[in-house]
Amino acid sequence: MLSILKKLFGTANDRTVKKLFSEITKINSLEPAIQKLSDEELKNKTVEFKEKLKNGATLDDIVYEAFAVVREAAKRVCGMRHFDVQLIGGLILHRGMITEMRTGEGKTLVATLPAYLNALTGKGVHVVTVNDYLARRDSAAMGKIYNFLGLSVGCIVGGMPDEVKRAAYNADITHATNNELGFDYLRDNMKYSLQERVLRPFNFAIIDEVDSILIDEARTPLVISGPVNDNAELYGKIDKIVRLLNASDFEKDEKLKTINLTETGITHIESLLSKENIIKPDTSLYDFENLTLVHYINQALRAHNMFTVNVDYLVREGKVMIIDEFTGRVMEGRRYSEGLHQALEAKENVKIQNENQTLASITFQNYFRNYPKLSGMTGTAMTEAPELKDIYNLDVVAVPTHNKVTRLDLDDEIYGSKKEKYDAILKLIRDCYDRGQPILVGTISIEKSEELSSVLNKENIPHKVLNAKFHEQEAFIIAQAGRFKAVTIATNMAGRGTDIMLGGNPEMLIEQLDKEHNYEAKIAEIKAQIAEEKKQVIEAGGLFVIGTERHESRRIDNQLRGRSGRQGDPGKTKFFLSLDDDLMRIFASDRISGVLRTLGLKDGEAIHHPMISRSLEKAQQKVEGHNYEMRKNLLRFDDVMNDQRKIIYEQRTEIIKSKDSHGFLNSTTEELAKKIVLTFMPVGSYREDWDIENLSVELHRVFSIKFDHNVVSKNDVTEEEITKTVIQMAHDIYKSKEEAYSSELMHNAVKYILLTTLDQVWKDHLYSLDHLRQGISLRAYGQKDPLSEYKREAFNLFEQMLNNLKELFIQTVYHFHIDLKNVQKEDVSLEYKKLQKNMCESREDPAFSKYNAGSSLETDLKPVVSRIDPKDRNPDDPTSWGRVSRNELCPCGSGKKYKYCHGANE
């Protein structure tokens, strides 16, 4: 019934596209008049549009004419005219939706339409890509159109200095990678003046390869971190011990990606630890004093048994580098958290870096939801449409191709073993190579690509390998994968964003020419050669894409297929599978093995059966559903932190903007003074119960006040009067500092202290949230909802953080002094970095940890004192306590608050 209704009325997507086609006629009707304009008149249209917007017009009022102007500009500048389907894609993007357009349909050109239109508001447009190469390429190519029309263009890539980035972000249209945007947002919110920030307020973003960024990378947060003091040596010792374990000592679940010691494993590892004098002979691994070792052991087990070199990570220049499982690219600057990266470094016998403490973090899910208007484009999004709608409120519209797709997608071939599968793949590659048909072979890991490469080398078949190890050559290799007799092996979707043109890409070959020797002649020669090869390739059947395994996601498989058959070109695709493949082995092996046994599959034979295809698709849907739930669950928890992050970042911005820092100082001084007095002189208590001695100690610790006991000796004195006296004494101390340093310098100093203290307590708060998050799932065993528990406890931690902020801030303000030796008397408007250099503290406190707020992950940040999990603290060893909050119970076990016990003299 449903299929009949769809035939009668069409799908919702069909109806949307039909409606959009009716709008395209309005743009096309303007084309003759726009064509008659001179270059100068065409450029002046930008000024005209801006004037209309200034006078109250909306973007929708000028959308058709603006699109017609961009189309004409592209034709004059680049020789490219937007097709009708590209105009439809532009309208979809402008309206804050995702457009699904097949590979080769010109998505880069499509983005110029909404980018130009929305840039007319002067608020900036971000065009987001997945790597630096694409950002540079697109800004250079499409920038010609924008510049012709009088708009400025910027490009953001890694490693740029802030002043260059600031100029690029202030341009009308900015091309940038998703990573740099996220990191710049975090870095901006760690800076000490608005002038140091590089980003403008969020406005409109167009995300290229939107599925890769919003779905594939959604589970990996961007993190800026600083090293903490840690026992790197212990990772090496534990690694050596874990290598001695037997397979029966642990059990792993590949579906759930977990690994745990068995009972025999615990006994075995306890004896090994005892021999190495890591634990005492008569103790258990799970005794209180040894509990910290469990973390190291678990991470070492994961490193050795759940992570594979050249699949999950690679080792380059003595460093362990993470490989993106979806793109096959190295994730520059990323490190696994919770000690896993250190465990991998120990496994690979490279230098073990210190563990890091999070200074700032955000997921792409929450970063991109900051934009008031968001859109995206990709070749594959319909399978993930429910998730994109649910999480980002983005509708997906599939746009028809300009030319009919003639690519032939052949049925999968399934073999009993990996060797049989590889033999069949090799036979097909040999056949295509002999006929000159170009082949692109997709693998799921570097290991598999190199394995296949070695097989082709033995068969003397020339080929190129494209994986994370050769990232710099990625675009060039993939662009030439359509040449006559070309054989290219690519990990997953490496090279995505670069079209494979039949016969080769002449522009990239021309770029490599020596411009001084016969340049024009060589260009003509290259173009002639490419044209000839294109004819040969078309005769051979176009690009043949071979998949060596099914991916967990159908979308990734569709992306691989989409590399062939661009713009109506001929081509073929085929997947080769075996029962040894991860997806088949983990999720579908039993069912499919039964079918194969029933059908009597013999060695070397392949099978094509609808039941197997359905089973495989169900397995993929199962994994997709599981991954979606993981991403959705991550978002639910991250939303809690995101709400708190927004509050902190807004407060930070307000502090920076503030021209009077005394308001918060005075109110907090009064609040703490009242609190301290009431602690030692409770309301309604007798005079003999007042603890004047500890009141004096606490007032000196917090305010640097030398409290006169004679004030209390008066018979008629009240708590209120003492509070007023304390507040006045605090104000007097502050005034004496103003007289010594000047009001303006003190204003800057107080602002700086407030910012650094806020950064410190926020950093500690992130650490606390991380620990809370790690164990919160166990609440389910107590019939409690982990998410509700997390929200409740995270709120309590946030309130505690704000209280700690007030106390640390006041304590620092009243104790600090400035070294004026290197400060010019006339220079009262010191920058924050100068203040940081010249400030001295009267005591050591983690609140004064210095780090470069603008540092990227690669920058060496000074070590910070971290908070230690309470269960890891030795009550008899204060050096093991780490950072202790003033209001926590003292780790020594006395039952008193830390500030009244071991922290009384700080």
Swiss-Prot record:
Zn(2+) binds at residues 890, 892, 901-902. Part of the Sec protein translocase complex. Interacts with the SecYEG preprotein conducting channel. Has a central role in coupling the hydrolysis of ATP to the transfer of proteins into and across the cell membrane, serving both as a receptor for the preprotein-SecB complex and as an ATP-driven molecular motor driving the stepwise translocation of polypeptide chains across the membrane. It is found in: Cell inner membrane; Cytoplasm. Gene3D superfamilies: Helical scaffold and wing domains of SecA, P-loop containing nucleotide triphosphate hydrolases, SecA, preprotein cross-linking domain. Keywords: ATP-binding, Cell inner membrane, Cell membrane, Cytoplasm, Membrane, Metal-binding, Nucleotide-binding, Protein transport, Translocase, Translocation, Transport, Zinc. It comes from Rickettsia rickettsii (strain Sheila Smith). The gene is secA. One of its GO terms (molecular function) is metal ion binding. The keyword Hydrolase does not apply. CDD domains: DEXDc_SecA, SF2_C_secA. GO terms for biological process: intracellular protein transmembrane transport; protein import; protein targeting; protein transport by the Sec complex. Pfam families: P-loop_SecA, SEC-C, SecA_DEAD, SecA_PP_bind, SecA_SW. This is Protein translocase subunit SecA. It comes from the Bacteria. GO terms for cellular component: cell envelope Sec protein transport complex; cytosol; plasma membrane. May bind 1 zinc ion per subunit. SUPFAM superfamilies: Helical scaffold and wing domains of SecA, P-loop containing nucleoside triphosphate hydrolases, Pre-protein crosslinking domain of SecA. Disulfide bonds: none annotated.
